[in-house]
UniProtKB/Swiss-Prot annotation:
Main enzyme class: hydrolase
Organism: Streptococcus mutans serotype c (strain ATCC 700610 / UA159)
Biological role stated in the UniProt entry: Catalyzes the conversion of N-acetyl-diaminopimelate to diaminopimelate and acetate.
Phylogenetic placement of the source organism: Bacteria, Bacillati, Bacillota, Bacilli, Lactobacillales
SUPFAM superfamilies from the UniProt entry: Bacterial exopeptidase dimerisation domain (SSF55031), Zn-dependent exopeptidases (SSF53187)
Catalysed reactions, semicolon-separated: N-acetyl-(2S,6S)-2,6-diaminopimelate + H2O = (2S,6S)-2,6-diaminopimelate + acetate
UniProt name for this protein: N-acetyldiaminopimelate deacetylase
Keyword set includes Chaperone: no
Amino acid sequence: MTLDLIKIRRDLHQIPEIGLEEFKTQAYLLERIAEITNGKDFVEQRTWRTGILVFLKGSRPQKTIGWRTDIDALPVVEETGLAFASQHEGRMHACGHDMHMTIALGLLDTMVQVQPKNNLLFLFQPAEENEAGGMLMYEDGAFGNWQPDEFYGLHVRPDFKVGDIATNTSTLFAGTCEVFITFKGKGGHAAFPHNANDALVAASYFITQVQTIVSRNVDPIEGGVVTFGSMHAGTTNNVIAETATLHGTIRTLTQDMSLLIQKRVQEMARGIATSFDLEVDVTLKQGGYLPVENNSQLAKQLMTYFENASAVNLIDCLPAMTGEDFGYLLNKIPGVMFWLGIDTPYALHHPKMSPKEEVLSFAVDNISGFLKTRTN
């Protein structure tokens, strides 16, 4: 069948749902998948919570190729002014996952026309933004005997033009780790500081000291990011704060560097707590947000294919400090992720982010050609 990719994208754009709550999205996808695969006896499918797996059994399979798309949205109030804007208050496909899903359906529609030689798995994965859905599915055994031998996926990128595909042969995205810290002292009257223990002061010293991790503990060639974007302490001007809570992020291009920075953050927090004679609780949450590390051999093959595709402008790009839970799956299964240009002035997660829709047919045409080289 011939899909109306723009209509599908706009349908999906109107029903954004956050991770593990993608019920309408899953229902819509299942309807389209049923239409696409109708009468194809070599296709099987199953669901995992709000996720979907579609398996094309190869005619003479030697391996299984995987294509992954994420399906969740963000808690963002849309400001695009589009006629097909979000119908779910406070929810928006501001990270382009509506584009990802549409491309995946287009690829499925193309690849199902002729039974491939090798197996081909399409993964419609929930909860990329908040719960590392790829990790949850893998750890729960959702793949079973459909687990790919090679895994591929993409992410849209606003500052690249339609026709641009960008990747590299090493790390594409950073690993991310959330940091939650609570300093607990003793509250009291501002006039009697000697009878209290000010958690706000301790937290302030920590915020200053933690800046030295990147400047003095991290190899400048490797790099890293430590950012605390939230600090809450105290209730009014004349009461000494009993507690101070901090929420931050660690971003690195290698897991070893992430572990080093996590270790130093904990050591500094405990050191500050000791020096101020108060308590501290440190919680680190990395989960499935490992660095997205491309398999060098598979990446070279993918880049060679797109380099020879006349419609594609291939870019050998530097890593980005954005995070992606596909990193967990690529830590378990060799594969490649790449950027797809969508040419919009607004960044990912911006309430006015609006991709150029002509990229949909471009992506389906060119990526399906690559998948055919892997499955035949």
